[in-house]
From Swiss-Prot:
Belongs to the glutaminase family. This is Glutaminase liver isoform, mitochondrial. It comes from Mus musculus. The lineage of its organism: Eukaryota, Metazoa, Chordata, Craniata, Vertebrata. Substrate binds at residues 219, 268, 314, 321, 347, 399, 417. GO terms for biological process: glutamine metabolic process; reactive oxygen species metabolic process; regulation of apoptotic process. It catalyses: L-glutamine + H2O = L-glutamate + NH4(+). Pfam families: Ank_2, EF-hand_14, Glutaminase. The keyword Hydrolase applies.
């Protein structure tokens, strides 16, 4: 009988997936130290949770089925409400934006539409009580919980964006660069435009400056077109027609490598050849539409336009590119049967595709996220294509400044004569900068300055030492309050009656039953001090164990009795009864489950 009990216990432990310190019963606390913690831990293990998995994350059905939603929803509500009975919607959206998420995020569409509908249908005046709040957030609970637990790639997003804004202002000073004039339509660009947008791999967004003004991708489309080609055709096939090495020459030179193919996809000759590989069996319109659909997916279906004026201007004044096209044709660089003029037309069209800094930053973030769009969760590009693309951007993406940029900045990037710089911090974020004045090598002067200042402050350089680079900031590290989540903070919050701090600790998955050297818990301290609201939070929201004994053998109820806190005594006595009942029910359920598991094994 004893061996059977041991086997059942082992199965019960396996069923609770590696619980910590006997947290197998779903009714026992702490809230995020049991089933909820396991669920969130699993979500975090699968690519930092749901924000950028391979499928769009619009709803969290698994959490709903496992019965965890009400408790997670409650904790989110308590954290944002800070003791109030109802939450103004604007307070929720403000708190949401502080995490980096936008109300327009496609993943939150269901949540935001429910909130809007609730406001219209109810007479609450834009206030959500706990029940309404749960209904609104239930389909996005895991994403929202991760956001408020600061479990995104950049935990303290407000602090990080504050630094970015200061760098933006520092780089804003007049540069002395000149707007590109060899394409007549580009010569009309406003030299005062200056904008920067970023999007992390978790979908955190920030923009500063002129980030909603459309501009042509120009050469920034080259790495994107190459990535699409490799995703659809494979690396080996694409590199039969284009090389991988920096040329050491100007981007528009009539030059081939020793194998008789363009040096790389980032020079004009290479980009024209790559354009010729796309959908070779289709007509011009179908080819352009095919690439545009890919670009739209990379941008999370955000703004994408087309400048016909730029396209016509390119065609009328693109003598150098026509010369390159005929040179490639003469050297038989195109696949058999390719129409050289059609390839040039597609190249001109793709250079004339318009984005904004905001939509461009999502495209860059898709590259940073291994080909998966962070705001839709859709897998757009293969991991192989992204790896190859970033490698070539690192070595060849900045014209004749590529070596210097790799040395000083150490990140994959691509510049364009429109004044754009598409910058990728792999596994962290993508950025798009826009400032039309160019330096003598054809790169945005403000953009280069911004990138250099960014890497001088943060340890984003490819070869920065992440452990010992003390002089640089690492925004990926949890800081401040999160770094100091110790039993001292927990017990001090209980001692001082700081329910808001306790809510934050619980939401960040802290074990609310931690003990000090006297084996006293937060519930002991709150009961001894008579903090009724703290006791309520610990027993109602966190479901902590009220029978933990300190080194003198006292449970929290004993402390409340000793210090004559009668309200706390009554509250704890009632909780003892309900806790024992729920524990008995949970043990019975676990016993039944173990028997079923044994029977299925037999």
């Amino acid at each position: 009988m004893r061996s059977m009990r041991a086997l059942q216990n082992a199965l019960s432990r396996a069923g609770s997936h590696g619980r910590r310190g006997g947290w197998g019963h779903p009714s026992r606390g702490p809230l995020l130290g049991r089933g909820v913690r396991y669920y969130l831990g699993e979500a975090a293990a699968q690519g930092r949770g749901t924000p950028h998995s391979h499928q769009p994350q619009h709803s969290d059905h698994d959490a709903s089925h496992s019965g965890m939603l009400p408790r997670l929803g409650d904790l989110l509500f308590y954290t944002i409400a800070e003791g109030q009975e109802r939450i103004p919607i604007h307070k929720f959206t403000t708190a949401l934006k502080a995490t980096g998420l936008q109300t327009s995020d496609p993943r939150l569409q269901d949540c935001m539409s429910k909130m809007q509908r609730m406001v219209q249908e109810s007479s609450s005046g834009g206030l959500l009580d706990r029940e309404l709040f749960q209904k609104c957030v239930s389909s996005n609970i895991v994403l929202l919980t991760q956001a408020f637990r600061k479990k995104f790639v950049i935990p303290d997003f407000e602090e990080f964006t504050g630094h970015v804004d200061r760098i933006f202002e520092d780089a804003k000073e007049p540069t002395g660069g000149k707007v590109a004039a060899y394409i007549p339509h580009l010569a009309k660009s406003n030299p005062d435009l200056w904008g920067v947008s970023l999007c992390t791999v978790d979908g955190q967004r920030h923009s500063v400056g002129h980030t909603k003004i459309p501009f042509c991708l120009q050469s920034c489309v080259k790495p994107l077109t190459y990535a699409i080609s490799v995703s659809t055709l494979g690396t080996d096939y694409v590199h039969k027609f284009v090389g991988k090495e920096p040329s050491g020459l100007r981007y528009n030179k009539l030059s081939l490598n020793e194998e008789g193919i363009p040096h790389n996809p980032m020079v004009n000759a290479g980009a024209i050849v790559v354009s010729s590989l796309i959908k070779m069996d289709c007509n011009k319109a179908e080819k352009f539409d095919f690439v545009l659909q890919y670009l739209n997916k990379m941008a999370g279906n955000e703004f994408m336009g087309f400048s016909n004026a730029t396209f016509q201007s390119e065609k009328e004044t693109g003598d150098r590119n026509y010369a390159i096209g005929y040179y490639l044709k003469e050297k038989k660089c195109f696949p058999k049967g390719v129409d050289m003029m059609a390839a040039l037309d597609l190249y001109f069209q793709l250079c004339s595709v318009e984005v904004t800094c905001e939509s461009g930053s999502v495209m860059a973030a898709t590259l940073a996220n291994g080909g998966i769009c962070p705001i839709t969760g859709e897998s757009v590009l293969s991991a192989e294509a992204v790896r190859n693309t970033l490698s070539l951007m690192h070595s060849c993406g900045m014209y004749d400044f590529s070596g210097q940029f790799a040395f000083h900045v150490g990140l994959p990037a691509k510049s364009a004569v429109s004044g754009a710089i598409l910058l990728v911090v792999p596994n962290v974020m993508g950025m798009m900068c826009l400032s039309p004045p160019l330096d003598k090598l054809g790169n945005s002067q403000r953009g280069i300055n911004f990138c250099q200042k960014l890497v001088s402050l943060f340890n984003f350089h490819n070869y920065d030492n992440l452990r010992h680079c003390a002089r640089k900031l690492d925004p990926r590290r949890e800081g401040g309050e999160v770094r100091n989540k110790t039993v001292v903070n927990l017990l001090f919050a209980a001692y001082s009656g700081d329910v808001s701090a306790l809510r934050r600790f619980a939401l960040s998955a802290m074990d609310m039953e931690q003990k000090d050297y006297d084996s006293r818990t937060a519930l002991h301290v709150a009961a001894a001090e008579g903090h009724i609201e703290v006791v309520k939070f610990l027993i109602e929201a966190c479901k902590v164990n009220p029978f933990v004994k300190d080194r003198w053998g006292n449970i929290p109820l004993d402390d409340a009795v000793q210090f004559n806190h009668l309200e706390v005594v009554k509250l704890l006595q009632d909780y003892h009864d309900s806790y024992l009942l729920s524990e008995t029910q949970a043990e019975a359920a676990a016993e039944t489950l173990s028997k079923e598991n044994l029977e299925s094994m037999v």
